[in-house]
Each structure stands twice: as structure tokens, then as C-alpha cells.
Amino acid sequence: MEFPKSFIRASEAYNTFEHHVPAPYLRRAFQVDHEAKANVIITALGFYELYLNGECITKGRLAPYISNPDDLVYYDTYEVTLRAGENVLGVWLGNGFTNNPGGHIWDFDTAAFRAAPQMALCLTYTDKSGEAHCIESDETWRTESSPLLFDDYRFGEIYDGRLEIPGWNTIGFDDSAWKFAERASQPRGEKRLCTAEPIDIVNELKPISVTKTEKGYLYDFGINTAGVCRLCVRGELDQRIELRHGEHLKDGLPGVENIWFKREHWARDLEYVHKDVYTCRGDGEEVYTPAYTYHGFRYVLVSGITEAQATEDLLTVLEMHSLLEERGGFSCSDETANKLQQMTRQSDVTNFYYFPTDCPQREKNGWTADAALSSEHILLNLGAERSYREWLRAIVKAQDNNGALPGIVPTSGWGFAWGNGPAWDSVLIELPYRLYQSVSYTHLTLP
């Protein structure tokens, strides 16, 4: 399959803290003369969810692979079955890595690649006569604002259930009032098929306690983990529910001092940090699951609900991370050593989102020195070599013309003047060596 010729977007306006721009829906209806197999190639600058005839077919969550689009643009492929007659492709875009002002401490708000989310897609199939057809991203696609009013990879989401558009991605939906998509410029980065393991939900947790406080209801899930909360509520029209996440308690409430950027914009950031917001439409049971963010937390403070709504069934934690296969483990007669192994593994998986990050609640950055030090024990426990290989490509691409590396990869350009140096550069030696030790890699093909 050839890479799509065109990227499209809803508009050039992108989301900021001061001016919220909703995540866009895009759709394209087309006719097929018989049931047929088809191949889809799709990428996005930002995150995407892909739908065919109303069914979400996305591989995992937070797709595609997170990268600097000036260096690498990753795409995914799908095999699908088209029905005879009308078919509908739907794409929902989130800001992802392309527009994450919540990372302003590392200059992501001023990144050269910062832009509105956009996508490129090509679906190919063969008709009854044997003629090949391609449905491609272009200006014939229709677009409309979704109920996701604000999404930031690091901070959270604001979703308004009153603005949902039932059937937007299904057959027979009238999109005549939607505007046409516009063409976007091609990113500079190399286009590559993603071979790293996808991120997906691996477990569900229910609260071990629910406690009433002056600020709302405190949900304790018993363990520090990473993912999102699925909210299930019978709410009233216009009821606004806020979920504030935290790893520890301070004065009986989730503490944010370890994740709150106390520099410029500190008051603004406190309003958004580690928080998801849902407004109810009030027509029965409503379910909301954040799509384009994740959090590191144990506790969730829920405000805006009644005592009757504050049940154990209100929230379910969806634990997420890269789907790395189990490789090894450790146990012995010493329970302290066993607990250390358990804690280490939990830390590893909750920080592995395509590549090893430093923390799932604040930075979500790929610090190279951290990864170099942790790679030995991670590879003893988990089959992470495919993800490591993909990340090594990004590391090589991040080098400047003098060969210097930033301290974090991917980066906006930050990290060449602080937080780097020999200890961080060692990832180019340490990581390939640990891959050789673990799975006998004798070469790494990295252009």
C-alpha cells in the first residue's frame, strides 16, 4: 500500500488553554458494488480513533505511535470487510503529541511542529470487475466539532455529553450540514509503519473505599497505576462532574504539588492539571471514558455528584500500557524481596507508553538516561525489544548536526542545553547492548 497523498484537517485553529478548539470528527461515505476485503493505511498528527460503519476498529488506544513529526511519522494498517452498498469511514482526532501545551515546561507549546490535529488515510479495494479503487483523505471528507471540547495529553479532557452527535460515523447519517475538510501541509518526517506494541487496556479496578469530603467524594483504588477512569452515571441535564487524580493525599485530598508546574501560568495550570470533566446530557445512564489522555494516580476526587451517585460503580479504573509480553519474573522466600520485584514491575509497565517514560502523571517524557539504566531489568521481565528498537530510531533522528542528543526523546527541541550529556547519551550504547544480551540482537538497522 502506498502512503496517502494528502493530509486533511478540520481547520488550522488549534486548541489552547485560552481558546478551546473541540476535537474534530471527520467522515466519508462511499459505495461498493459487492462485499469486499479492503486495506486501510492511516496516520495522524495527534491521536486518532478509526471507525468503519459505526464500529471502532482502532488498534489499542492513543494511536498512532508518539513521535516528533519533523523526524518520524508513524502509520498503522488495517484489514477490513466492506459491505455491499454504502459504507462509512469515520475518524475522530485528538491533539496528542502534536499540540500539547500542557508540556510548556519543555517548550512543547512553542514547538515548530505544533498544529491542529490532522490525518492521512487511504482505503483500497477491488470491485467486481477487478478494478482497484482508493478512498483517500481529501477535501470531499466532511467534518464537525465533537463533544470533546478540550484535550491535552498531559493534563486531561473536557467533554460535554449534551453535544454528542448520535450516529455520526454510521450509514445513512445526514452530514449535509457539515463543512468540508481542508488540506493540510505534509509533515517533514520519515513515514514508517509502526512495529512497536500498541497501548491498550489491560485491567479494570474498582475502588476499595469511597469517602465523603468537603470538596467531594474521594475514591481510593488501592494502588498507584496509570490509565483513565470510566465514568458511569445517571446524571441531571447540565450536571458538571470533575475527576481530579492524584498519587498521594495531602490534607485528605489528592495532592498535586508534585505534578503542578509552579512557574509561569501556575494558576491556569492548577485549573486543568490531572483533571477530566464531564457534563451530563441527563437522558439515562451515561458512560464517559477519556480518549486522548491518561493519568498516573491512586486517588480520584469526584466533585459535582450527589451522595446517591457516589457509589462504587460510578468509577472504574482502566489500567493501560504498552502490550508487552511477559518474559520472566522473580520470587523467593523473602517477602520483602518479592514486594520489591512487584513494585519494580508495576513501575515499569505504568511508565511504558510506546517507550519508557519517567512518570505517567507529570512529564510523560522519554528521558534517555532513565531508560538506559532501567533497560536491563525491563528486558529480563518484559518482551520490550520491538518498542525499544522503534524508540532507538527516534533517538537517532533527534541528534543535531553535531551528533548531540537531547535529554528527552521525542522532544520539541528542548533538552540540548540542560538535562543531557554523557549519562544521557549512553542510551545509544547501553540500550543496544542490553538488547544484544537479552535477545541476541547482533545488529540494529537504523537509518
Regions found by a protein language model. Give the residues of each.
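The substrate-binding groove and active-site-proximal loops of carbohydrate-active enzymes
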Residues: 415-418, 437-438
